[in-house]
Amino acid sequence: MNLRPLHDRVIVKRLDQETKTASGIVIPDAAAEKPDQGEVLAIGPGKRDDKGALIALDVKVGDRVLFGKYAGQTVKVDGQELLVMREEDIMAVVNAK
């Protein structure tokens, strides 16, 4: 991937959501109101505070994150659709069990 985010921006690959329930009922995309999930592919160096000190990001490459339906900007890189968003658009990091 030849995309390097700047400042507090994060590159996220959207993960497919479950479209079927455990009982086999198919859920249409319009009815699924869950936040989207994705994997962090790259992060910027962070943003600067008022004194110019760099504040590192809380997310790391490889983290699985939750974000809102309209978060970020979609870009196409090497035939793959990715999202570029600010770290503040990320709602949570999903911890593996």
From Swiss-Prot:
Function: Together with the chaperonin GroEL, plays an essential role in assisting protein folding. The GroEL-GroES system forms a nano-cage that allows encapsulation of the non-native substrate proteins and provides a physical environment optimized to promote and accelerate protein folding. GroES binds to the apical surface of the GroEL ring, thereby capping the opening of the GroEL channel.
Domain of life assignment: Bacteria
Cellular component, GO annotation: cytoplasm
GO MF term list: ATP binding; metal ion binding; protein folding chaperone; protein-folding chaperone binding; unfolded protein binding
Any Gene Ontology biological process: chaperone cofactor-dependent protein refolding
Predominant location category: cytoplasm
Cell compartments where the protein resides: Cytoplasm
PROSITE patterns linked: CHAPERONINS_CPN10
Complex and partners: Heptamer of 7 subunits arranged in a ring. Interacts with the chaperonin GroEL.
Family as reported in the entry's similarity comment: Belongs to the GroES chaperonin family.
Organism: Burkholderia vietnamiensis
Keywords: Chaperone, Cytoplasm
Name of the protein this chain belongs to: Co-chaperonin GroES
